[in-house]
Each structure stands twice: as C-alpha cells, then as structure tokens.
A protein has these predicted regions:
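Single conserved hydrophobic/aromatic residue that forms the stacking wall/gate
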Residues: 1-11
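Local cysteine-cluster metal-coordination motifs and their immediate loop/turn environment
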Residues: 12-42, 69-89, 107-121
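Non-heme iron-sulfur electron-transfer modules
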Residues: 28-48, 52, 79, 90-101, ...
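Short Fe-S-cluster ligation motifs
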Residues: 46-74, 100-125
C-alpha cells in the first residue's frame, strides 16, 4: 500500500502501527474519519476518500492545519496528519467541543511528543474559524 500511495502523491498519511491503534493513518471516507491501515480499498470503493492533502483549498491550508502550525500542535509531525483529520471530523460533528470532548475524541490518536496540550489548544482555535 505504501508504494501505491507514493505513486499517487498521497504520502503524508502515515502508517505507524498497522493495527489500527495509533491513529497516524486517519483519512476521511465520505466525511468521516477512518483508520486507513486496516481498511481494504474494496471497502471504500465508490466512496470519497480524503487525505490531509485534500484539506487545502486553492493552495491555502485548512483552518485546522493553520491552528496546529500557529499553536505548535506538532513536534516530529508523524502523528499530525491523522490527528488533524480526526480533529476536523470532530469539529464537523461538534462545533464547540470542551477540552474533555476533544481529548476523548482524539484518544485513538497517539502522540509521543507533545503532551496534547497544544493539540487541544489548536482544535479550540480551529473551532473559532470553521
């Protein structure tokens, strides 16, 4: 699967655990987040699949990407695509989540670098712009 993604220039979604535990591979399928490492292409045939590359509009970053950048919601960047995609899905379903709701929603996305404080702050910032 990695070679196919690289050929299609969709290389920012990550495979971390390959067992659907870390969340680095999250993409949107028909607008809902899905851990792609354990999903078969046949399962999403005919669906709209969006990777982090698909969030930008006319070369401009999505508000969630801007917030992660502005508020340092990333360090090494490995988990960032999945974290951003999950956070966007959250805000599509809940426009003003509490800190607890954000943390609960993102519990399937593991980050070993940030301690999550800046990630939660970034999600709250993006909520004001989405």
């Amino acid at each position: 699967p990695v070679n196919r993604r690289q050929r299609q220039m969709c290389i920012r979604d990550s495979i971390g655990c390959d067992t659907s535990q870390c969340g680095a591979c999250v993409v949107h399928v028909d607008g809902n987040s899905l851990k792609s490492c354990t999903a078969l292409a046949a399962d999403v045939n005919g669906s709209k699949v969006t990777t982090i590359e698909g969030l930008e509009t006319n070369g401009k970053m999505h508000p969630m990407q801007e917030a992660f950048k502005k508020l340092h919601g990333l360090q090494c960047g490995f988990c960032t695509p999945g974290m951003v995609m999950s956070a966007v899905d959250l805000l599509q379903k809940n426009k003003k989540p509490s800190d607890t709701e954000i943390r609960d929603w993102l519990e399937g996305n593991i980050c070993r670098c940030t301690g999550y404080q800046n990630i939660v702050a970034a999600v709250k910032e993006a909520a004001t712009k989405m």
